[in-house]
Amino acid sequence: MKPETLLREANEIQSQILSERRTLHQCPGTDFDIGETLAFVKKELADMGLQPVDCGRAGVVALVGGKRPGKVFLLRADMDALPIREEADVDFASQNGRMHACGHDLHTAMLLGAARLLKAHENEIDGTVKLMFQPAEEIFEGSHDMIEAGLLENPKVDAALMIHVMAGMPFPAGTVIVSAPGVSAPAADYFEIKVQGKG
């Protein structure tokens, strides 16, 4: 897979990715209640010749490659929205009292686009790419649910990558920020602080 070939092919499916993002934006679900989004993702994966497999309460996984030996690389997109009423004046606005305010519709559409490119070059892949479509990121439960359901096994994942769009940052459109190797995304976790003192 030559980078220039992938870039050309990505540009060729850009309008499809945009259309899918807008479709997903119109039917957001929250937490594990993402039925329309999940059905859309599974249909798109099946239509491109992949086999979507349920994982956990509302997640889905698909594999690309596996025809040649190599490591297993996981690509992840979150699918859930927030319980916010959308007030945007666009023709693809959500009407159901929920909203993709964090860009998860875009993440899902981008991973579907990546799946198309990977499927088109499946015979060139050393190893396997595991596609992870995750629910319930906003309530900090979706990834744990999928891991408990065996996400990281069969085949065992060697490395993973996720992306997140960042509106409002002081960078021009199209900028990609890559962090140092290792764990770099913030944890969606809880912690407790005890303060002792006179007061």
What residue spans do the PLM features occupy?
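Histidine/acidic-residue-rich, glycine-tolerant segments that coordinate divalent metal ions
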Residues: 82, 89-99, 123-199
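Acidic/His- and Gly-rich active-site-bordering loop/insert found
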Residues: 2-101, 105, 109-126
